[in-house]
Amino acid sequence: MHWTLAGNLAEVLAALEAAAASGAEGCVCTELALTGFHRRLPELLDPAALAAAEAQLRAACARLGIAAAVGMPTLGEGGAVFNSHAYIDASGREVGRVHKRGLTASEASFFTPGGARGWTVLGGLLATSVLCREMLDVAALLPELAAVPAGSEGLPRVVFWPSYIGASDAEQAALCRAYVDGAEMLARELGAWVLQSNWPEGLNLPGPQGFGASVVIAPDGRRVAVLPRDAAALQRVDIG
């Protein structure tokens, strides 16, 4: 994570390059990957700079022939700022966004909560996103994810889980376990893969804080992979 838009954009572009080089057809990035999730975020909300960064992401996806789901702020009307996960297809076209609704108290002092979410067809998958602590809200999410777009019933379902969570102490470790329990339940109930992309570090509190350790959960609720803790990593997942 970096304090600047340029630094974080470079990291996302490098991740897309690495994913494409591995033969992947898509890449899932973290919560607010484009800006970083830190106390200087309000300084990075210049509309022109954000638009230029998003244009670079779309161009990279088109050049590499890879789809991406990338966390970024969305600037709305009346000064609203949403914490969003944006979907870009392999032609470089944005095909959807999910705005985080289940905000923490501190997030709610800055971000505007999103509304109901649905599914988006992305790279031959039926995708949606559950952002960070929203994995505690599975009971509320299931009804709005019950319906799928017409004609997409046979596509594999994938829930992207961009996050910024760390098991920094016993209380936070217990909370992280509750998040994963929610993710496993969501996978089973929807028959969907859950792909977490958690930040491997934070800037507000330097040093190891128990970040990373992203999980891959199969549609039957089994945890099939756990990435390294407090370290950046790329995991290829084959979804059929």
Regions flagged by a language model, labelled:
Residues 1-2:
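Generic N-terminal amphipathic, Lys/Arg-enriched alpha-helix
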Residues 112-114, 208, 231:
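Residues that act as N-cap/strand-start positions at coil-to-secondary-structure junctions
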Residues 5, 9-90, 165-192:
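Cys-nucleophile CN-hydrolase/nitrilase-fold catalytic domain and related Cys-dependent amidase chemistry
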Residues 50-69, 136-229:
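CN hydrolase (nitrilase-like) catalytic-core segments centered on the catalytic cysteine
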Residues 76-157, 162, 171-181, 239-240:
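Active-site catalytic loop in hydrolytic enzyme cores
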Residues 102-104, 229-233:
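A short acidic/small-residue loop/turn micro-motif
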Residues 70-72, 84-87, 118-119, 212-216, ...:
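Short beta-strand scaffold segments in enzyme catalytic cores
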